[in-house]
Regions:
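Short secondary-structure boundary/capping segments
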Residues: 9-11, 32-35, 58-60, 85-86, ...
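C-terminal effector-binding regulatory domain of bacterial HTH transcription factors
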Residues: 117-126, 134-175
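Alpha-to-beta junction loops
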Residues: 13-20, 41, 106-112
Length: 175
C-alpha cells in the first residue's frame, strides 16, 4: 500500500493496492480498477463558522470567511462560475495538498472547503460540518480502488493485501 499523490505514476510491480482520483476508470496492463467513492464535491464548513442565520453564498461572503483549497484554485473557480457567482481575479485562501488537512481545517472553522460528499458524509451526519449548497463540482470524478494483477510472492504480503481488501469491502458494505 502506498500514499499516492495526484499526478504521480504508480509502479504496480512494487505496489499491490492504491486509490486514485480520476475522471475515468484507470486502464492499464497489470491492474484491476473499480469505482470506490464518488468525487462529487460541495461547499462545507463548520457550524461554528456559519452560525445560525441562513447563509447566502456570495463571493463576498465566501472571501470574508475564507476559502480552503484542495491542491489548487480550480475547484473554487469552477464552483463559483457554475453558481453564477462572479469569480474574483484573485482567490485567496490556504491550499492543502492533503485532503485530510483540508478536512481538518474545515472542521476547525478556518474557512469553507469543497469536499467530496462521500468523504465527509459522517461529518455531515454527525453535525461536525454543514453542507452549504447543492451546487457541486467534480461530479465526473471518482475515487478508484486499483489492484495489481500480480500476486505477491511473499506470503505475509499476500495476507496483508487480502486482509486490507476484506476490511475495505466490509467498510463499504456498512456505509
Amino acid at each position: 500500500m502506498i500514499y499516492a499523490h495526484h499526478g504521480h505514476e504508480i509502479d504496480f510491480t512494487a505496489t499491490d493496492v492504491a486509490f486514485t482520483f480520476a475522471d475515468t476508470r484507470p486502464v492499464a496492463e497489470g491492474i484491476l480498477a473499480e469505482p470506490f467513492l464518488s468525487g462529487r464535491s460541495v461547499p462545507v464548513a463548520s457550524p461554528a463558522l456559519v452560525g445560525t442565520d441562513p447563509v447566502t453564498l456570495s463571493a463576498e461572503w465566501l472571501l470574508g470567511v475564507g476559502l480552503l483549497h484542495d491542491s489548487d484554485l480550480s475547484g473554487w473557480k469552477t464552483w463559483l462560475a457554475r453558481s453564477s457567482t462572479v469569480v474574483p481575479d484573485r482567490l485567496p485562501g490556504a491550499i492543502f495538498e492533503d485532503f485530510n488537512l483540508l478536512r481538518a481545517a474545515a472542521l476547525a472553522g478556518q474557512g469553507v472547503a469543497l469536499c467530496s460528499l462521500a468523504m465527509v458524509g459522517p461529518d455531515l451526519k454527525e453535525g461536525r460540518l454543514v453542507q452549504l449548497s447543492e451546487s457541486s463540482v467534480l461530479d465526473e470524478f471518482d475515487y478508484y480502488l486499483i489492484q495489481s494483477n500480480l500476486t505477491p510472492r511473499d506470503a505475509g504480503r499476500r495476507k496483508a493485501r487480502q486482509t486490507f481488501l476484506s476490511w475495505i469491502d466490509d467498510a463499504r458494505t456498512q456505509a
